[in-house]
Amino acid sequence: MLRFTEDHEWLRLEGDVATVGITRHAAEQLGDLVFVDLPKVGTTLSKGAAAAVVESVKAASDVYAPLDGEVTEANDAVVAAPETVNQDPEGAGWLYRMRLADPSSLDALMDEAAYAALPK
């Protein structure tokens, strides 16, 4: 199940763990990424709180926690090679995984059709 936020983050749910990243639109708007800072495993995130930072040649941007939960994994590959986020933002360029405090809260986020209709 793929869901999106208005802040241009995506989540893919597998069981009660969501993989989180930024959308292709966000990656294109940022330009070439040169730095990624991810949350540490075990960090408890609250919806709307800054969870990660992506920095490009244009700007630095916070990536917000889309829902409440605990970080279970960080994608160290994008820390070592930030350009992976630009090349495959909704695949190999994922940022972190989190165990959702309430998996049903995912229903409040947008599906692909609703995200596609969002003014950009």
Curated annotation (Swiss-Prot):
InterPro entries: 2-oxoA_DH_lipoyl-BS, Biotin_lipoyl, GCV_H, GCV_H/Fam206, GCV_H_sub, Single_hybrid_motif. Keywords: Lipoyl. Binds 1 lipoyl cofactor covalently. One of its GO terms (cellular component) is cytosol. The modification N6-lipoyllysine is found at residue 58. Its cofactor is (R)-lipoate. GO terms for biological process: glycine decarboxylation via glycine cleavage system. Residues 17-99 form the Lipoyl-binding domain. It comes from the Bacteria. Belongs to the GcvH family. The glycine cleavage system catalyzes the degradation of glycine. The H protein shuttles the methylamine group of glycine from the P protein to the T protein. The glycine cleavage system is composed of four proteins: P, T, L and H. This is Glycine cleavage system H protein.
